[in-house]
Amino acid sequence: MIVTKKQTCYTDLISRILTLDIAPGSMLDEKLLSDEYELSRTPLREVFQKLAGEGYLNLQENRGAKVSSMDLPNMRNFFQSAPMIYAAIARLAAENANERQITALKMAQKRFRMASENSETREMAMHNHEFHRIMGDMAGNPYLSPSLNRLLIDHTRMSQMFYKPVNSKERLLVWEACDQHDQMIEAIEKADPATIVELTMEHWELSRGRIEKFVRPDPLDMDLGMQEAGE
């Protein structure tokens, strides 16, 4: 299958947005991207329109394309909605998954575990995104899928913090999350919706605290500030 420049631009921009290579709220430079991907204005704008429809960008009249922000109202909506959406998707996935989808989920988990073993933050975040996107495919609900996909955009961006552990305790959390994926796959194979909903909520709570630190970091050391002021 031949991959066009337009397809390359589309998939690459998704990756760059999800991994924070392009920061939330950034305006995209149409001329720069046109040169980088060797696309004329019309196909590039078609890529922007597709990404906007999926929640990655906001198109502003006479101002161009802006990466979806992660401001306070958005984050509030994220933390309110995530548990409900993840639980509903998980239940439907356990009820509706087919063998082909389960195989795809196992492959995504294999890639996620390999990235975890190699401490590859970017790859862990992207493979986790893939894992939960496949669960959305399993659910097969046209009303929930757009909500899940939009949720995953912000979750993946914030998970850069979770997948960059700074001590042994945080590294153990990453491994626990990896093991929970295996347990979720097992529950799906057994068509056990009650178990997977419980696992999904545990999975959410495991990462929630670390994700919150992304938008609410620890305050600066007051003693250090006072010391610098006195010098």
Q: Where in the sequence are the language-model features?
A:
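Short linear motifs at protein or domain termini
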Residues: M1-E95, R100-Q101, Y143, E212-E231
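Regular secondary-structure segments
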Residues: I14, L18, A90, A94, ...
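A ubiquitous short alpha-helical element
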Residues: M70-R76, A90-A97, A115-E120, K164-L173
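Hydrophobic packing residues in well-ordered alpha-helices of helical domains and bundles
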Residues: F78, L105, M124, N128, ...
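Hydrophobic, amphipathic alpha-helical faces that serve as interaction scaffolds
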Residues: S81-A97, E130-E170
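Residue-level marker of structural boundaries
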Residues: M84, K110-M114, I153, R157, ...
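Amphipathic coiled-coil alpha-helices
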Residues: I85, A108-R111, A115, H127-I134, ...
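C-terminal all-alpha effector/ligand-binding and dimerization domain
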Residues: N118, Q160-E231
